[in-house]
């Protein structure tokens, strides 16, 4: 809340940040403000601070219908004043010393404050927030009675089947399918797919003949596993009329797809294919219907309520009105549930008892009564529109679980509630209400138009405005109904000559809040909008810059939020983006295993544009925009989005004032974007030209010459630029530079002059190195060079003291400079898909904040804590330089990234190096490779290390005698890994008292039945065996060792002990597989791709080559085990040793 109070918002504008900026200006003794100007500034600051102190708790902290407050005349004036004051301060700061001495920057603003704020503020009261009554709420979400239930039959049948038969879908979540737009492409080849049940040759002949005789059809083919799909290729085909004709001829037809022939339709087909896990049918006692506002949640719930009602002893349908907290309407809802359950009356509200209890006591009384009444009954409970999880928790407590076949249906528009229901209760199935298919959507829209008598004036083919409505509505039933009704009204008003203007739908989109026939749709959308806190509304309104055909790039949007001043930190902005997904405003497509993309429903975007226009927050100009209205608007354009089809020449030819525009976003194929008059944008702070293929080097140079010095964000991603011009150095206040996916091959030296740069993103470029001048970017907190040919980072990155995120993913980098240990604020280091296997040990200094992403996993590797500071303070400066050669932090090995990085001694050694013993006794983990034995004094040193929790011992050669671990020392050790040809080790009584994990990595060797003694490891929980695929687990030495450990595990007092043995992913039970031969016979499936195997090979350290004995007695001749380890790829299967308890 505190951070949000200081941000730019749609309601209060730049009021909070500009007050901070004005205070800093007044406190700066070197700003050379004249006495009169200082007095003006102090007056403005005093008056606006009083307004801010009133608005902050009342607007920022509340939900509800704040439109009255935010559109109030005084607040609107303060909002515009804040933007102008922000510009005035920046204008003054750009002046030189002499100009400042004669400037009077705040005189006019002071007069405005006196006239329009001060004189009105004393009697001004904040308009009261209000929520619509429950009757309005319920009306908004339902279609009119005469609209028909087009497309609801299939949903009803699916849901009834779930309730009556259960589900075989192990995910318990039926996902909504991405919408496939219905496109009419005059003159272009189309591919149209129909589904037609053709039971015999006669029906097939009828269908094929009809399709073949249709105008525009070039070819017809039969497809589908059941040969029930007709694929049509042609141009100018009226698919809706063809579907109608097919239904008359053969009884049924469904439109599956309309696309251009040149498109690859495999991607769409793959997206639409349902993915299910086959399992046993399980009972579904509760269905959570999830969907967008206007998607038909309430309608289908009512259909189910009436269709199934006779099967239940009692039934309830209760709707919940939205509120800022769950408490106001909850008692009323509980009373409604009890009344309906008792009396079976759907619209009666009654109090179930005559007591005088209030508050929680009354709620609890209702819960107890409902639960007691329903306990022995078969019930159907429908709870419509859950807004708060706390509401559902209370209602759920009142509904008892029994075995009488009771069913619960709930609806919500919030993803977060559906996900929590799904996680908390195995009996819940989440059913996402999808869009109506294009055929049903066209039928619904056309039916409303023809019912009104306007069907003959709407047009046919590509002139049929119903096609545009279907594309805009994305199959949302409520939007289809009311927009089709509005279209009829517009046609009546405009007449046939204006019908092409209707086709653009721009005037209808812009009138969602004003056209009377669209009021029910607007009310439904307002419910969700008003439920958002102000900071989320601000971020959401900014999304109105997009056209409904644009996909949203998450990182791009998040960083523009930061540049606009809505949010200060990227992590915070990412969290807000997630909130908008959870609340259903932004839709995510894809999953964790595929490319994710995001979009906002077109109807929601139209609604947001209208809201944005009310606040003068952002202006969108695109195809069909009324340019004369935009030019004549009395309010200045603060933020501008130019969308596909808008002629940029209009900007210079009209009287549109963009001198106070702070943000310009250019989306899509804007005609001649290089012709945008950037010199007119005198106060521009955000410029996004991403994916404009018309922008090249010469254009960028001219743009930089024209740009305002105040530009904070410059987005050039996806343009055709090859280099950054020297003129960029003038952008002294640039904070975010986004040049990914361009053709640039180097960063100019002038990059070091951008002292305020916070984010530098050069991903997917041809850059091969970072310039030394990067050390000058002291404010940089994000450096992203992923997918570039960069092979080395300069030591100067250690000078970036404020760096928080560094991404070198999928580059040629093999080793990171030791200077990264100086990056005390680093939080995320992404080295996935690189040859980086180790970090300098100095990186442990930042272990408390750093998360390392390594290998091909998204799970972070934590660095060992609490030792590096002690090490650095205890090691003399002269010795410290040598430590890099004897110690590093391993973040990945042959088996993927560990959960916690391990201090590793590089190379092979005859003994533990003296430097380790002298200076690194306090380590919490250690990984070291010895030649063939562990000397007694070395074991004593390891046993006495006070903090040692993880130990990895690797042996080049098979030890001649078993390594004996006695009951002395290793008091803190929890994880012990032995890497040897065979695990020649024996644990004596009371050895390693806190050891929980024992892991063996072995290859081959002579068979031995010697005891290992794991029964002496009193805290042991798991034993892991990993063996090379070159030596299968039926090799004599390996199988004998496994048998020994299995036998000892069965005798362990902590049984069952879990054994993990590399054998693919097949789970092996000791009851059915009593010998090692059976274990060896298990599948050894290798699921890791060849590239991943190659990437996981250890990096070669050049400084160790050809040096004989390398460091402190390292052995250069022992390399067999190392070689085998480098080639090892294995998989693990779970074996749980279950033994019968004997008395």
Curated annotation (Swiss-Prot):
Domain HMA: 189-258
GO molecular function, one term: ADP binding
Structured coiled coil (CC) domain: annotated segments: 1-190
Xref: InterPro entries: Disease_R_plants, HMA_dom, Leu-rich_rpt_typical-subtyp, LRR_dom_sf, LRR_R13L4/SHOC2-like, NB-ARC, P-loop_NTPase, Rx_N
Domain (NB-ARC) ranges: 282-570
Keyword Repeat among record annotations: yes
SMART domains: LRR_TYP
Keywords: ATP-binding, Coiled coil, Leucine-rich repeat, Nucleotide-binding, Plant defense, Repeat
Domain notes: The HMA-like (RATX1) domain is responsible for the specific recognition of AVR effectors.
Family membership noted in the UniProt record: Belongs to the disease resistance NB-LRR family.
Subunit structure: Interacts with AVR-Pik through its N-terminal part containing the HMA-like domain.
Protein name: Disease resistance protein Pik-1
Biological source species: Oryza sativa subsp. japonica
Top-level taxonomy: Eukaryota, Viridiplantae, Streptophyta, Embryophyta, Tracheophyta
